[in-house]
Amino acid sequence: MEKRWLNSMLSKGELEYRCRLSKSINSLGPIESEGSIINNMNKNIPSHSDSYNSSYSTVDDLVGIRNFVSDDTFLVRDSNSSSYSIYLDIENQIFEIDNDPSFVSELESSFYSFRNSTYQNNISKNDDSHYDRYMYDTKYSWNNHINSCIDSYLRTQICIDSYILSGSHNYSDSYIYSYICGEGGNSSESESFSIRTSTHGNNLTITESSNDLDNDRTTNYSDFWVICENCHKFNYKRLFKSKMNICEECGYHLKMNSSDRIELLIDPGTWEPMDEDMVSVDPIEWDSEVDPIQWKSQVDPIEGDSEVDLIEGDSEEYKDSSYKDRISSSQIETGLPEAIQTGTGKLNGIPVAIGVMEFEFMGGSMGSVVGEKITRLIDYASNQFLPLILVCASGGARMQEGSLSLMQMAKISSALYDYKYQSNKKLFYVAILTSPTTGGVTASFAMLGDIIIAEPNAYIAFAGKRIIEETLKMEVPEGSQKTEPLFEKGLLDLIVPRNPLKDVVSELFQLHAFVPSNQNSIK
C-alpha cells in the first residue's frame, strides 16, 4: 500500500497545527471511507499547543478547513496515476477539471456520497473545537460548507504535484458544487457559467462565458505553463528554459527562440552582434495594392502548411494590418529588428561566426534584410577565417517582398560558394536545421552545409504536405517530412539533441583544425 503525504497549515484564531493524511493508491471511493485508510496514525490527538503533528481518525476536522484553494492552478494526479489540470478561481467563479468526463463523474459520485454520509448526522459536533454552530444556519453558510467539503475531497483524493498561488482567499457562491453536480450550470433562471479550455501551440487558455454574451473572459496561462505539442503534458515555464525547451515527459524538442539558442551555443560574455541597425521596409510597396491579397500565412503560399503557418496568421487583426505594421508588431513581440540574429562569439573557446533565425518574427521568413545580414556574415567569416554556423528556423521566402525575397536564395548560395571553394581557404560551414525549416531556406543555404545537423523530430521540407497533396493529388505519408526519415534517406549527416549539441559542434570544428583561441595563441 502506497502512502501519499499531504502537509498543510491549518489555522483557526491563534491556533495553528499540521494535519497529515495517508492515502491508499488503490482507493477512489467516497470520502467517508478515508477513516479506515488512515491506519498508522496516533489514536490520541495531541494538544494544539504541544505539537504540530496532530492526527485524526475522522475526516470531520478536515472539513472545517477553509480557504484551502481560492485562485490556484493545479497539476494533479489521481490514485490511478492519471494526470489532470484543475483551475479554481472562486472570486471570478471559474472551476475547470481538464475536460475529462470520467474524472468529473468520479468527483460527482464521491461528493454526493460524502454529502449524504452519516458523518454529518451521527458525529457529535459539540466535541469538535473547530465546529462552527452557524455553519448550517443560512444558505450562504451552507455554500461555504460545500466548498469546504470539496476542498476536503480534493485533499484526500488527489496528489498535488505543483501549484501556483495568487493570494486570494475569499469564497463566494457554490458554483463549484454546481459545476460538479450539474445543478444550475445550464439553468436559464439563474446566472450560468461555462468553462472552455483551448490550446494553441504551447499556450493554455481558459475561457469563462456567462448568459451575458458581452461578459466573456479569457485567461491565458502561457505565462505559467508550456504544453508539449507531442504528448500534451504541462511543463512549468519557469524551469522550461533550464531544460532547453525539451519536454520532461516525452523528450520532445519544442520551439526555441533565437536568443536562447545563442545562449545555448555561445560562451557567456563572448557574443558580439552584427548589423543590428538593419530593418525591413516595403521594397515593392506591398501595402499600396488597390486590392491587397488576403494572406493566410506570412510565407510563400507554395510553402504553406499547417505546421508552418503562424499562430497569428489566422487572426483578423493580422489580415487587416499592413506589412509595415506586421513588421512593427513582430519587432515589439520579439525585441528584434529582423527575423535573424547574426554575430560572432566563442563556442567552447573557438571563435565562430553564427546566424540564428527567429521563427516568431513573421515565421522566420527570409526577406531582403535577412538575406543581406546572412551574406555579410559569410563575407566577414571568410575574411576572418572563421567557421560558420547558421541555425535555420523559417517558413521560407517572405511573400510581401516578392521576387526580391527569392533573390536572397541565389545571393546567399553564391556567397557560400565563394566562402567554401573560390577563396581556397578551406573554411567550414555547419548548418543546424530546427523545426520548421521549409521553403526557400531549405532550397538554399540550409542544405549547403559541409555538415548538416538536425534536431530530433524537426519538420524539414520544401513544399508542405497539404500543398503537395492538393497539387499532385497524392497522399504524403505521415511523418515523411520529419528528421528521422530524411536522415535515413541520406539528406542529413547527424541528428543531435540540444543537450550535447554544443560539444558535438565543438568537436567537429577541432577535427577541421579550428581550435580554441587560447591554444592557438600558445602555438
Curated annotation (Swiss-Prot):
Signal peptide coordinates: none
Record-listed Zn(2+) binding positions: C228, C231, C247, C250
Cofactor note (record): Binds 1 zinc ion per subunit.
Cofactor field: Zn(2+)
Metabolic or biological pathway: Lipid metabolism; malonyl-CoA biosynthesis; malonyl-CoA from acetyl-CoA: step 1/1
One Pfam family here: Carboxyl_trans
Domain CoA carboxyltransferase N-terminal: 224-523
GO molecular function, one term: acetyl-CoA carboxylase activity
Function: Component of the acetyl coenzyme A carboxylase (ACC) complex. Biotin carboxylase (BC) catalyzes the carboxylation of biotin on its carrier protein (BCCP) and then the CO(2) group is transferred by the transcarboxylase to acetyl-CoA to form malonyl-CoA.
PROSITE patterns in UniProt: COA_CT_NTER
Subcellular location: Plastid, Chloroplast stroma
Protein name as annotated: Acetyl-coenzyme A carboxylase carboxyl transferase subunit beta, chloroplastic
Keywords: ATP-binding, Chloroplast, Fatty acid biosynthesis, Fatty acid metabolism, Lipid biosynthesis, Lipid metabolism, Metal-binding, Nucleotide-binding, Plastid, Transferase, Zinc, Zinc-finger
Family as reported in the entry's similarity comment: Belongs to the AccD/PCCB family.
GO biological process: fatty acid biosynthetic process; malonyl-CoA biosynthetic process
Complex formation: Acetyl-CoA carboxylase is a heterohexamer composed of biotin carboxyl carrier protein, biotin carboxylase and 2 subunits each of ACCase subunit alpha and ACCase plastid-coded subunit beta (accD).
Gene3D superfamilies: 2-enoyl-CoA Hydratase, Chain A, domain 1
Zinc fingers typed C4-type, residue spans: 228-250
EC number(s) reported in the record: 2.1.3.15
Organism: Cucumis sativus (Cucumber)
Reactions performed catalytically: N(6)-carboxybiotinyl-L-lysyl-[protein] + acetyl-CoA = N(6)-biotinyl-L-lysyl-[protein] + malonyl-CoA
